[in-house]
Regions:
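Helix-loop-helix hairpin linking two adjacent transmembrane segments in secondary transporters
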Residues: 1-36
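Juxtamembrane intracellular "pre-TM" segments in multi-pass secondary transporters
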Residues: 37-64
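Extracytoplasmic gate region of multi-pass secondary transporters
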Residues: 54-112
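Helix-to-loop junctions at the C-terminal end of transmembrane segments
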Residues: 111-124
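Structural signature of the two symmetry-related core transmembrane helices
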Residues: 126-141
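Paired small-residue
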Residues: 149-157
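Intracellular juxtamembrane helix-capping segments at the cytosolic ends
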Residues: 163-178
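A late C-terminal transmembrane helix in Major Facilitator Superfamily
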Residues: 176-205
């Protein structure tokens, strides 16, 4: 929304964002291609898929996996339902209600940026707890409020609170089993499928 107001659209409207994303992606690929990365040599045999899944038997890893699922589920779910909430409760049109998605990403981006500084001063555990508390308060607010400003505040709090959950959970899971970094990384990334599970459940509900 903001980008299409500030740059020429060439009669493409919001679709102008796709060429911009493509250019950014190509630049990132080229820069990554010329970046020297020293990878550690793997010792021993690679773990099998079954051995990776067996790590879910450890409570901390299982909770981290569920945390990643919830993080992505909240992310996708908020994007899809926030405009719908505004349309149902305030009678807004789709074009106006779509600003809720932009608002979510504005606060999510701000949270990612500020999180890098906050985590220098605060422990990951405390920051994670505050982030979750912000989201819980905001979600409760979405059930209660019918005022546009308060709904916007709740959406912003969810975006800010959810901005650093993935990085905190992912890093803590790796620190828990430093000898199984590849396996743990694979499991955490597998948790991204929560983005398909939670919106489906929300749609059924």
């Amino acid at each position: 929304w903001g980008a299409t107001q500030a740059i020429p659209t060439f009669d493409l409207g919001w679709r102008i964002l796709f060429p911009i994303y493509m250019i950014v992606a190509v630049i990132a690929i080229l820069l990554l291609n010329v970046t020297q990365i020293k990878e550690e040599k793997e010792e021993g045999k690679p773990s099998t898929f079954g051995q990776c899944l067996a790590l879910l038997g450890k409570p901390f890893i299982l909770l981290s996996f569920i945390g990643i699922m919830c993080h992505v589920g909240i992310d996708v779910g908020t994007n899809t339902t926030a405009p719908k909430i505004l349309m149902e409760r305030l009678g807004m049109g789709l074009d106006d209600a779509a600003f809720a998605t932009s608002l979510y990403f504005i606060f999510r981006t701000a949270g990612c940026f500020l999180g890098s500084f906050i985590l220098r001063k605060m422990s990951p555990k405390s920051f994670f707890g505050i982030s979750v508390l912000m989201m819980l308060i905001a979600m409760a607010g979405l059930f209660i409020f019918h005022d546009k400003t308060m709904i916007y505040v709740c959406i912003g709090l969810i975006g800010f609170g959810n901005s650093n959950v993935f990085s905190v959970v992912f890093s803590q899971a790796l620190l828990y089993l430093p000898g199984k970094k590849n396996e743990v990384s694979g499991l955490m990334i597998m948790g991204l499928f929560g983005g398909t599970v939670f919106p489906l459940a929300m749609g059924v509900a």
